[in-house]
Amino acid sequence: MRTLWIMAVLLVGVEGSLVELGKMILQETGKNPVTSYGAYGCNCGVLGRGKPKDATDRCCYVHKCCYKKLTGCNPKKDRYSYSWKDKTIVCGENNSCLKELCECDKAVAICLRKNLDTYNKKYKNNYLKPFCKKADPC
């Protein structure tokens, strides 16, 4: 249980259904979401904000923008369900807001996988986020 709490605090975006988001990232990238993305660049994880450092960091920036576009639900609290079929994330909600929330998380997981080649260890564990340059608005 403690491991899940730590994961919830450090995950990319720190919002939404953190357990599901973490599972999606692990399934798509094969990387531990906490240790690989919990404090990556300027936008992944806690206090994430600023001009993206690379394509991987941009995935997290776009994810935060996706959450900002949601209406009628609470990305910080609402939970959704999804399945993993044939190495594909399938969002399984009838509620439109929860489906959109799931789609935001699915998109970031896929984006992180597609940009694994841009992952730069020098941006991992970036606890200097207050020094990140201001990003353009979503």
From Swiss-Prot:
Signal sequence region: 1-16
InterPro entries: PLipase_A2 (IPR001211), PLipase_A2_Asp_AS (IPR033112), PLipase_A2_dom (IPR016090), PLipase_A2_dom_sf (IPR036444), PLipase_A2_His_AS (IPR033113)
GO BP field: arachidonate secretion; lipid catabolic process; negative regulation of T cell proliferation; phospholipid metabolic process
Residues with site note (Hydrophobic membrane-disruption site (MDiS)): 128, 131
SUPFAM superfamilies found in the cross-reference section: Phospholipase A2, PLA2
Region (Important for membrane-damaging activities in eukaryotes and bacteria): 121-134
Family the entry assigns: Belongs to the phospholipase A2 family. Group II subfamily. K49 sub-subfamily.
Name this polypeptide is given: Basic phospholipase A2 homolog M1-3-3
Species of origin: Bothrops asper (Terciopelo)
